[in-house]
């Protein structure tokens, strides 16, 4: 019975409406999510500006332009260090360099080149009948 009641609520020209009758996520929800992300970004930037001195902020900005993923990792490490109380005062440029080197060492991928020489197939002695 409940299903029949739901169908009776639909208008007879429902088929003509097509996709417009499908409930869409409200624009308010998208706006709210965007606003929340913007607030989190602002809070993160505020924390980082309190953690780093001017030279270190400039270096982090340069890193964010060149390698955004690595900059996000460094920012996360800085915020975690600040929350744990591992930082005393503002971090200098040298301290940021050391942190960047540690993050790079942890995330560095080992690249290797492997040559697969097929000696049996490319043996030139067989071709020359020596």
Swiss-Prot record:
Record field: compositional bias (Polar residues): 1-27, 36-46
Swiss-Prot/TrEMBL keywords: Coiled coil
Cross-referenced Gene3D superfamilies: PDCD5-like
Highest rank taxon of the organism: Eukaryota
Transmembrane segments: none
Residue ranges of coiled coil: 27-51
GO cellular component: cytosol; nucleus
Organism: Caenorhabditis elegans
Family statement: Belongs to the PDCD5 family.
Name of this protein: Uncharacterized protein D2005.3
Gene Ontology MF term list: DNA binding
Region (Disordered): 1-46, 103-130
A Pfam family it matches: dsDNA_bind
């Amino acid at each position: 019975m409940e299903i029949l009641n739901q169908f009776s609520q639909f208008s007879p020209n429902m088929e003509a409406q097509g996709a417009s009758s499908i409930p869409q996520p409200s624009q308010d929800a998208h706006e709210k999510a965007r606003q929340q992300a913007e607030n989190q970004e602002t809070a993160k930037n505020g924390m980082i500006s309190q953690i780093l001195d001017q030279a270190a902020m400039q270096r982090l900005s340069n890193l964010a332009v060149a390698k955004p993923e690595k900059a996000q990792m460094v920012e996360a490490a800085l915020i975690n260090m600040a929350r744990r109380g591992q930082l005393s005062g503002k971090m200098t440029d040298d301290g940021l360099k050391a942190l960047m080197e540690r993050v790079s060492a942890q995330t560095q991928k080992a690249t290797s080149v492997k040559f697969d020489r097929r000696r049996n197939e490319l043996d030139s002695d067989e071709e020359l009948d020596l």
